[in-house]
């Protein structure tokens, strides 16, 4: 859980920018999107293999 306190003399925009930076750095949103719904292990393996194949093809 990210926690950001407003510093003295800091605007709300600056605080929000710092909060967004800490959330993206922690990977909170990525983790939430990943856990949005359950993916069976077999399906997960197939998706990862397909992504790796596509990535290799681009190189």
Curated annotation (Swiss-Prot):
GO function term, MF aspect, one: structural constituent of ribosome
Single GO BP term: translation
Any one Gene Ontology cellular component term annotated for this protein: ribonucleoprotein complex
Alphabetical keyword list: Ribonucleoprotein, Ribosomal protein
Organism: Acholeplasma laidlawii (strain PG-8A)
Record's protein name: Small ribosomal subunit protein bS21
The gene coding this protein: rpsU
Family membership noted in the UniProt record: Belongs to the bacterial ribosomal protein bS21 family.
Record's keyword annotation contains Ribosomal protein: yes
